C-alpha cells in the first residue's frame, strides 16, 4: 500500500476512535510508522489537511457500500434494514462502528473550518442522494424523498452515536423498528 493511502487509512481509524482532537501528532506518526517530514510531505497543511483526506476517503467508502446495499435490495425498507443490520452486526462484533460515522471525528470541533465542513456536508449530501433516489424510485415525490433522506441520515447517525454512548446496539434496533412506520406515514403525504 502506498504511504499516503496507509496514512489516510490509519488516521481515519484513529480519528473515528478518539476524535480529531484526541489524536496527537506523535501518536499519528507512531501508528502510521512515518516521520514528521513524511507526514508534511504528503499533507503540507498538517493534521487538518489529513482530516479532510480521511473524510474524502470515508465518503467514497461509505457511499460505495450504501450503493452496493441499495442496489441489492428492491425496496427502500429492505435496503435500509439491511444497512442497519450490517451496522448492528459490526457494533456487536467489535464494540464500535468504524467506517460509517464521521461525527466522532469532528464533533468536538466547535467551529469547523470551511474545508472540513464542506467535506462533511458532501458526505451527508451523497448518502442522502442515495436514499432520496431509492425513495423516488418507489414513487415518493422529490420533496418527500429529500425530507425522508435527511431524517434517515439523522436517525442512522444518531443511532450510531447512541450505540457508542450507551454501549448497546439497541438504539439502532429502535431506528430499524420505527422505519416502516416512518416510510408508511410519509408516503401518505
What are the language-model segments listed below?
Residues 6, 10-53:
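Helix-turn-helix
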Residues 21, 71-74, 139-146:
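Short, charged helix-capping/linker segments at alpha-helix termini
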Residues 55-61:
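Short, basic, alpha-helical segments at the C-terminal edge of helix-turn-helix-like DNA-binding modules
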Residues 113-114, 124-148, 186-189:
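Hydrophobic alpha-helical bundle segments that form small-molecule/ligand-binding pockets
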Residues 78-82, 93-115:
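Amphipathic alpha-helical segments used for helix-helix packing
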Residues 67-94, 149-152:
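Hydrophobic alpha-helical connector segments
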Residues 90-93, 111, 133, 153-170, ...:
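Amphipathic C-terminal alpha-helical segment
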Residues 103, 143-162, 174, 178-181:
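Hydrophobic alpha-helical segments that form the core
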Amino acid at each position: 500500500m502506498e504511504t499516503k493511502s496507509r496514512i489516510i487509512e490509519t488516521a481515519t481509524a484513529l480519528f473515528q476512535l478518539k476524535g480529531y482532537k484526541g489524536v496527537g501528532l506523535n501518536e499519528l506518526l507512531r501508528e502510521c510508522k512515518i516521520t514528521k517530514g513524511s507526514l508534511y510531505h504528503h499533507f503540507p497543511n498538517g493534521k487538518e489537511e489529513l482530516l479532510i483526506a480521511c473524510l474524502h476517503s470515508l465518503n467514497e467508502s461509505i457511499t460505495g457500500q450504501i450503493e452496493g446495499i441499495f442496489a441489492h435490495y428492491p425496496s427502500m425498507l429492505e435496503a435500509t434494514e439491511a444497512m442497519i443490520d450490517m451496522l448492528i452486526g459490526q457494533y456487536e462484533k467489535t464494540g464500535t462502528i468504524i467506517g460509517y460515522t464521521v461525527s466522532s471525528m469532528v464533533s468536538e470541533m466547535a467551529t469547523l473550518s470551511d474545508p472540513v465542513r464542506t467535506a462533511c456536508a458532501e458526505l451527508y449530501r451523497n448518502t442522502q442522494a442515495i436514499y432520496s433516489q431509492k425513495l423516488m424510485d418507489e414513487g415518493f415525490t422529490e420533496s418527500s424523498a429529500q425530507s425522508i433522506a435527511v431524517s434517515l441520515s439523522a436517525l442512522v447517525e444518531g443511532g450510531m452515536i447512541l450505540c457508542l454512548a450507551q454501549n448497546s446496539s439497541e438504539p439502532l434496533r429502535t431506528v430499524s423498528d420505527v422505519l416502516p412506520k416512518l416510510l408508511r406515514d410519509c408516503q401518505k403525504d
